[in-house]
């Protein structure tokens, strides 16, 4: 056994006695500026350290990159579509949430939309295109089924041909 049973019982009953102070979410922060302060008994703080660094660090990274994209879009809406490439389903929800905080207008992640009130948007799947004899037929069928909100996924085969279709 890696850990002694007494320590595992301690962890099962552990309730951290810490205070956490942080800047408001979405606030601009510069390098080497403290974002979060955790105070309490050393053991309590150390047991929380890795989880806090993981959660805060990852979502801060995503929000920073997203804010740059939103700024480059110059007022045009930006949609988040990261679920297919995210590190696990919970990572996809975290990415959607952090992107929304950073200025994305919507997400393709239905669970994140439901959980956090983020507007949901999206396209058809690549499998939709693959289920038709040609890409153009798939696009026409999707446009007919979604005439008021049609966004086509153009990279199933070849992006240039997708744009032409």
Predicted segments, located by residue:
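N-terminal functional module of multi-domain proteins
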Residues: 6-8
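Buried, small/hydrophobic-residue-enriched core segments of structured protein domains
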Residues: 11-17, 26-165
């Amino acid at each position: 056994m890696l850990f002694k049973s007494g320590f595992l019982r301690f962890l099962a009953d552990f309730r951290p006695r810490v205070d956490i102070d942080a800047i408001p979410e979405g606030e601009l922060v510069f390098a080497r500026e403290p974002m979060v302060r955790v105070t309490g008994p050393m053991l309590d703080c150390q047991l929380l350290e890795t989880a806090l660094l993981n959660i805060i660090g990852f979502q801060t990274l995503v929000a920073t990159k997203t804010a740059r994209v939103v700024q480059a879009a110059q007022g045009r809406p930006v949609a988040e579509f990261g679920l297919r490439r995210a590190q696990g389903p919970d990572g996809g929800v975290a990415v959607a949430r952090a992107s929304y905080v950073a200025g994305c207008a919507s997400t393709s992640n239905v669970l994140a939309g439901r959980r956090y009130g983020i507007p949901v948007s999206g396209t058809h799947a690549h499998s939709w295109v693959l289920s038709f004899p040609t890409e153009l037929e798939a696009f026409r069928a999707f446009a007919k089924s979604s005439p008021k909100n049609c966004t086509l996924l153009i990279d199933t085969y070849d992006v240039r041909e997708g744009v032409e279709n």
